[in-house]
């Protein structure tokens, strides 16, 4: 238990940030799943629209240090590879 006012405030701030970060991480995972579902259903338009949203959100997450920038780049690259592999053959 914190005894100092600034420590109490730090605890409140940490709870708020933790909630926001977990919500954003969950959103990242959900978006990735939606893209994979669109790929599985062979829907290129939906997959590309979702991919654009996903890359934008990854960039924002990297910018705010939710994930590392190289992690974001790797996720974008791997998802783009999957999209190209499925829809280039079609």
From Swiss-Prot:
Keyword Plastid in record: no
Coiled coil regions in record: none
GO biological process: translation
MF (Gene Ontology): small ribosomal subunit rRNA binding; structural constituent of ribosome
Bias (Basic and acidic residues): 1-11
Keywords tagged on the record: Ribonucleoprotein, Ribosomal protein, RNA-binding, rRNA-binding
GO CC annotation terms, alphabetical: cytosol; small ribosomal subunit
Region called Disordered, residue ranges: 1-29
Function comment: Binds directly to 16S ribosomal RNA.
Stored NCBIfam families: S20
HAMAP family documented for this protein: Ribosomal_bS20 (MF_00500)
Family: Belongs to the bacterial ribosomal protein bS20 family.
Protein name according to UniProt: Small ribosomal subunit protein bS20
Species of origin: Leptospira borgpetersenii serovar Hardjo-bovis (strain JB197)
């Amino acid at each position: 238990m914190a005894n100092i006012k600034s420590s109490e405030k730090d605890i409140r701030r940490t709870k708020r940030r933790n909630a926001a970060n977990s919500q954003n991480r969950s959103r990242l995972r959900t978006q990735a799943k939606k893209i994979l579902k669109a790929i599985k259903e062979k829907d290129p338009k939906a997959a590309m629209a979702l991919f654009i949203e996903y890359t934008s959100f990854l960039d924002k997450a990297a910018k705010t240090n939710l994930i590392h920038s190289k992690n974001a780049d790797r996720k974008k690259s791997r998802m783009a590879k999957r999209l190209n592999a499925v829809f280039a053959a079609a």
